[in-house]
From Swiss-Prot:
Residues 321-429 form the CULT domain. The modification Phosphoserine is found at S25. This is Protein cereblon. The gene is Crbn. Residues 1-48 are annotated as: Disordered. Component of a DCX (DDB1-CUL4-X-box) protein ligase complex, at least composed of CRBN, CUL4A, DDB1 and RBX1. Interacts directly with DDB1. Interacts with KCNT1. Interacts with ILF2. Interacts with TRAF6 and ECSIT. It is found in: Cytoplasm; Nucleus; Membrane. One of its GO terms (molecular function) is metal ion binding. One of its GO terms (cellular component) is nucleus. Zn(2+) binds at C326, C329, C394, C397. Highly expressed in brain. It is a peripheral membrane protein.
Length: 445
């Protein structure tokens, strides 16, 4: 484990630095060498075929294959008050449905997890907008579904896979005599809004409505005609109101989901509808978990209690926030929305944990700029098996941005990509759009 002086390096490393390939330079005595990223990144192109097994990142094989798995789930009643223990070292905003991998070595945390396994396996993850914030107002319950204990250098370590379940509002926080923090929370309900046309159409005639059969593929002209015909029939009752059909479609869950799916297909050309949740609530959380937004925006999404409003906000963010800059510099562009792609079944971004217990939500992109590479490539504890990682820092302020991943075999595709940590990125609205300053643009929140 890293010493006190190496805490920052421990947060950025996936494992110890081990050379994957012999260094080109003869100066092999330097433990760490700085390399400025060359034109290789700028010339990177999107590969036509991805032969990487996208199920590997979601399985978190780096935690070990022999984890004890649990079945069933714990759900609390809406608006009920619960007292749930808090894991203090989990500094991320967990979204319901999002997977949270953990590696815990502190005796207090190990003891707490053991007790949770004997009960309902549920703990609280508090949502802080920044590390200086002392009290959180919202959070998400997390349920452990896989667990493993082992010893590393005589230290007991617990490896956990958990999943976000329900949003809550924090009512009270108190610390027990054993140091474990307990949170009294109120479970927040999901507001399910009726159909936009429900007020003007007779429910008795719903069974008489006939809709065209859904196309198998969305890539041909027939699909576009099908959707236009479907929209006309779905909103035909708008003719009886004072408002146009397009206005109702802005608050229709199915229409919003379809527009977001078109954006997601730009990140993953092989995306299939059956791999996405059909329920608007689950779908909205799935999208929220893979959006590269900062903590302030993410908490705003977590506060929203309606799937339709959440979908509207997500679509607005995807359309406007097209540039990702260094959070420390705020003006140094690292990548753009067009470079995002998916190398995992859960989308372009997911949470991973390094051997030191630091959780990073990592976004995969083809191309990144204004970055320096630190050290040599290493395959130790790689979140993407078959790829070696190298620490990447901002070229201007030297803050940690993520990692560059390079394939260890020539037949792998893509040969290289970047994994950028969400906490280091700042979503930005380019000034060229609509000639409006980003500070004056208001998102649909």
């Amino acid at each position: 484990m890293a010493g006190e002086g190496d805490q920052q390096d421990a947060a950025h490393n996936m494992g110890n630095h081990l050379p994957l390939l012999p260094a080109d330079s003869e100066d092999e005595d330097d433990e760490i060498e700085m390399e400025v990223e060359d034109q290789d990144s700028k010339e990177a192109r999107k590969p036509n075929i991805i032969n990487f097994d996208t199920s590997l990142p979601t399985s978190h094989t780096y935690l070990g294959a022999d984890m004890e798995e649990f079945h069933g789930r714990t759900l609390h009643d809406d608006d009920s008050c619960q007292v749930i223990p808090v894991l203090p070292e989990v500094l991320m905003i967990l979204i319901p449905g999002q997977t949270l991998p953990l590696q815990l070595s502190h005796p207090q945390e190990v003891s707490m997890v053991r007790n949770l396994i004997q009960k309902d396996r549920t703990f609280a993850v508090l949502a802080y907008s920044n590390v200086q914030e002392r009290e959180a107002q919202f959070g998400t319950t997390a349920e452990i579904y896989a667990y493993r204990e082992e010893q590393e250098f005589g230290i007991e370590v617990v490896k956990v896979k958990a999943i976000g379940r329900q949003r809550f509002k924090v009512l009270e926080l108190r610390t027990q005599s054993d140091g474990i923090q307990q949170a009294k929370v109120q479970i927040l309900p999901e507001c399910v809004l009726p159909s936009t046309m429900s007020a003007v159409q007779l429910e008795s005639l719903n069974k008489c409505q006939v809709f065209p059969s859904k196309p198998i593929s969305w890539e041909d002209q027939y699909s576009c005609k099908w959707w236009q015909k479907y929209q006309k029939r779905k909103f035909h009752c708008a003719n009886l109101t004072s408002w146009p059909r397009w206005l109702y479609s802005l608050y229709d869950a199915e229409t919003l989901m379809d527009r977001i799916k078109k954006q997601l297909r730009e990140w993953d050309e092989n995306l299939k509808d059956d791999s996405l949740p059909e329920n608007p609530i689950d779908f909205s959380y799935r999208v929220a978990a893979c959006l590269p937004i900062d903590d302030v925006l993410r908490i705003q999404l977590l506060k929203i209690g309606s799937a339709i409003q959440r979908l509207r906000c997500e679509l607005d963010i995807m359309n406007k926030c097209t540039s990702l800059c260094c959070k420390q510099c705020q003006e140094t562009e690292i990548t753009t929305k067009n470079e995002i792609f998916s190398l995992s079944l859960c989308g372009p971004m997911a949470a991973y944990v390094n051997p030191h217990g630091y959780v990073h939500e990592t976004l995969t992109v083809y191309k990144a700029s204004n970055l320096n590479l630190i050290g040599r490539p290493s395959t130790v504890h790689s979140w993407f098996p078959g790829y070696a990682w190298t620490i990447a820092q901002c070229k201007i302020c030297a803050s940690h941005i993520g990692w560059k991943f390079t394939a260890t075999k020539k037949d792998m595709s893509p040969q290289k990509f970047w994994g950028l940590t969400r906490s280091a990125l700042l979503p930005t609205i380019p000034e060229t759009e609509d000639e409006i300053s980003p500070d004056k643009v208001i998102l649909c929140l």
